[in-house]
C-alpha cells in the first residue's frame, strides 16, 4: 500500500534513480527529447545519461512524486499547478507521465533486486498511475 511506497521511496537515491529513469525515457522514447531542448547535449545515450540537467530534473520529478504521495486524497489539487504547466505551457503528451512511471519501475527493479517484490511493484505502479492521472488533469 501507500505506506510501503513511502517507506521504499524514502530509501531511494533520488538523483541516481530519478536521473537514470529520465535519461532512459529520453533514450527509449527519443521524441520526448523535444520537451528538453534547453537541456544541452542530448545527442547520444551517453550524453543524455551524463547530462547534469537531465539528472537534476529526474531527481526533482522523484522528489515531487514522493511529496505528492503524502497527499493521496488530494493528489489532483497537489499537482494542479504542475499539471497546468505541463499541459498549457509545455504541451507534454500525458502518455509520457505513464511512460516515465514504467521506466521508474524498471530502474527501481534494477537498483533494488530482491527487495523489489511483485507486491511493491504493484503498489508503485498504482501510485505512479495516480500521479499520472493527477498530472493529466490539466488536459481535460
UniProtKB/Swiss-Prot annotation:
The gene is HBB. Belongs to the globin family. It comes from the Eukaryota. The beta chain is a component of adult hemoglobins B. And C. It holds the Pfam family Globin. This is Hemoglobin subunit beta. GO terms for molecular function: haptoglobin binding; heme binding; metal ion binding; organic acid binding; oxygen binding; oxygen carrier activity; peroxidase activity. It comes from Aquarana catesbeiana. Keywords: Heme, Iron, Metal-binding, Oxygen transport, Transport. Heterotetramer of either two alpha-B chains or two alpha-C chains and two beta chains.
Amino acid at each position: 500500500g501507500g505506506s510501503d511506497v513511502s517507506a521504499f521511496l524514502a530509501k531511494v537515491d533520488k538523483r541516481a534513480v530519478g536521473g537514470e529513469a529520465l535519461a532512459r525515457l529520453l533514450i527509449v522514447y527519443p521524441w520526448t527529447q523535444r520537451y528538453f531542448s534547453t537541456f544541452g547535449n542530448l545527442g547520444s545515450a551517453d550524453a543524455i545519461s551524463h547530462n547534469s540537467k537531465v539528472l537534476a530534473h529526474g531527481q526533482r520529478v522523484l522528489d515531487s512524486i514522493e511529496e505528492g504521495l503524502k497527499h493521496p486524497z488530494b493528489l489532483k489539487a497537489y499537482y494542479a499547478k504542475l499539471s497546468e504547466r505541463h499541459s498549457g505551457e509545455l504541451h507534454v503528451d500525458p502518455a509520457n507521465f505513464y511512460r516515465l512511471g514504467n521506466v521508474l519501475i524498471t530502474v527501481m527493479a534494477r537498483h533494488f533486486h530482491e527487495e523489489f517484490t511483485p507486491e511493491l511493484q504493484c503498489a508503485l505502479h498504482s501510485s505512479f498511475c495516480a500521479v499520472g492521472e493527477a498530472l493529466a488533469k490539466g488536459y481535460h
